[in-house]
C-alpha cells in the first residue's frame, strides 16, 4: 500500500512537484472571490505549457493563488484515510463532473463566497499580503484605555449606554450574529433575522421587490445583457388617464376651425415642405429616410419600417382613445342631466304642491263667496248682515291671505258688500248723528283699502275697493244731505266732517269740499247783506277755516267789498263796525287788511279828530275815545299819522294860547300829564309822538324863561323845569329798558339757536315761524303727492327735499324761506 497520500497526492515518489487539473474545493470556494490573484497566461506558457519555466519574480506574496513550496518548514501530515479503488474514484470523478456541470448552469452569485486559505496550516500561521502575520494580540493595548474615539464621542455629548444621535435614536447593542442550524443555504431554515434587526428595521421587502431583485441578479451572469433581441416595451394607458386627458384636451372629432389660404412652410426636416393649413402640419407622419433632428441620437437602421401602417395604427389608437373620452363625456353629461332633472322634478313637485294647496284654498274661498251671494238674495231665509259679512272677509284675509290679495276685491265687494252698505245707511241723517257708521267703515277700510291713501283722482280711486265703496254708497247719500243743508247752520256739517275726515280718502274729501260745500258757501255769501242780516258772516264762515283754509280765499274779496259798501255811511260813533271787522283781522292777509282800513276806516277817524274841540276848561273826550278804540285794528303808523295831522297841531295851539295869558302852571302841568296818559305806551314810544310832547315841554320852558320882569307864579319855573327833567329822564329810562330787552332777546335767541340746532328743514321753518310769531302747523288729513301739507299763517305749503312749495292759483310754486316769511306777514 502506497504511503504517498500521507504526504499529498500531488507529489510523486521522487519528490517532483505535480499539479492536478481537477476542480478542488478551493476552486469552488474562490470562484466568486473578487480579491483573488488573477494569473494571466504568458506567451511562453502558451507555447510550452507545463514545461515552461517559471519566473521567480512572479512569486510574490498575495492572498490567493497556489503558495510556493517552503522546504524549510516542517513536514505537514494530513489525517489518515483509506484510498478508494479505481472504480470508486471513477464514480467520484463522474459525480464531480456532474456537480461541476450543475454549477455552471447557475450564476456565480449563488456560489459560496469563501476566501482561499494558504493550505493546511493553522490560522495563527497565516500571513497577509506584504508578509504581515495575523496575531491575536494585535491591538491588545486598547484593553487598558478608552481610545480617542470614545473621548471624541464624549466631547460631543455621547452618554454611555444610550444610542447615538440628537435624540439617542441609534442602536445600543452591536450587530448580533445568528448561527445557522445546518449547512443549508441562506433562508433554508427560515428567517435568520435577530430580535435587534426586527426592532431596528421592522419593514420587510415585499415579494414583488424580492422578485425584481432576483431578476436583476439573474441578469448579471449573462454574457451580453445589452445585446441580443430586446423585448418590445409596451405603453399602457388606463381609462382614468384617458378621462383626465379628455378633460383638458380637445376632441379629435370636433370640427377644427382651419384658416383658409394659410401657407405653412415646414423646414424641420431634410427638405422644405409646404402645407396649406395647420391641421395638415399637425397630422404629418414620419417619412422613411428623414434625417433626425439636431442633438438626437442616431438609431439603428430598421430593417422593416412601414410608416403608413404605423400611422394607421396610431390613428386607430387615437380614435379608440377619443371614443373612450367621448363616452366618458356623454356619461358625465347624462349624469348631470339626471341631477338637473332630479332638481327640476323636486321644484315641479313643490310647485305642484303649492298649486294643489292654492286650488284647495280657492275652492274654499269660492264656496264662501257663493254662500254669501246666496244669502244676499231678497227671498233668502237667513239674510246676510253687514257685521257677518265683515267677519267673513276677516276670515278670508287671515286664513287665505294670498288668495284674498290676488282676488278682485273690487268685484267681490261690489257684489256682496255694496248692497249691504246701502241698506245700512239708507235711514241715516249725518247732521243729526255724525258718528253713525264710523266704526263699521273703519273696519271695512282695513279690509278693502290697498294703500292708495295719497291718491288725488277718481281714476286712481276706482282701482281701490274701499274708495269705490265710499264713492258709490256713502257719497251719494251725502250729496242729498248737503243739497238740503243751510250754510248758515254750519256747526252740524263741520262736526260731521271732523268725525269722518280720518276715514275719507284725500280726493273724496277734496271733492266734498270743492264741489259740495264751497258752492253752497259762495252762493250764501253773494246773498249776504251786512246791513240787514242779523247773523254775522264770520259766525258761519270761520268754522270752515280748519277744513277748507285757502279754499275760502275766493270768498274774502266779495266779503270785503260788501263790508266797504256798508261802511260808506258809517260813523265812528257806531261801535258795531268794529265788532263785525275784528274777527276778519287774522283771516285777511296783512296787506289786504291794511288797505281795507286805510280806505274805509282811517278817513272816518281823521274826520272825527278834525272836528274834535280841545278845551282845557271843559273837555269832552267821546270823540277822542272813538279814535283810540281802533288802535288794535289799525296799524300804529296809521294811528300816529292821523294824530300828527288832526290832533297835535290843535293841541299845541291851545297850549300856546293858554301860556300867553298868565296861566296857572300847575294846571298846565296837570293838563299836560293828563293828555299824555290818554295814549298807550305803544303810541307814546313812537318817535313822532315823543317829538310832539317834547315840543310841548320846550314851549312851556320858553314861556317860563321869557317872562322876565313880569309877574310869575311862585315856583312855576322850577315846576316846569322839574317836569321837563322828569319827562326826559322817563324817556331815557324807557329807551334804555327797551335796548336792554332787545339785547336780552337777541342773546336768548343766539343761545337757543346754539343749543338746539334745527335737525332738518322743517325744524328750521318752525324756528323761523316762532321768531316771527307765525303759526306753523300741519293740516290733518291733507297731503299732496305723499307730502304733508302745512299752514304757515294762512299760506298752505309743503316741503319736498329741502324746498318749500307754496300753493298758487293752479300750481305749486317753489319759494325761499325769507319770501315765505314776507308773504305770511
Swiss-Prot record:
Entry keywords, A to Z: mRNA processing, mRNA splicing, Nucleus, Spliceosome
Region annotated Disordered, chain positions: 1-135
Matching InterPro entries: G_patch_dom, GCFC_dom, STIP/TFIP11_N, TFP11, TFP11/STIP/Ntr1
Compositional bias annotation for Acidic residues: 11-25
Keyword Nucleus: yes
CC terms in the record's Gene Ontology section: spliceosomal complex
Record's subunit section: Identified in the spliceosome C complex.
Identification of the protein by name: Tuftelin-interacting protein 11
Origin species: Xenopus tropicalis
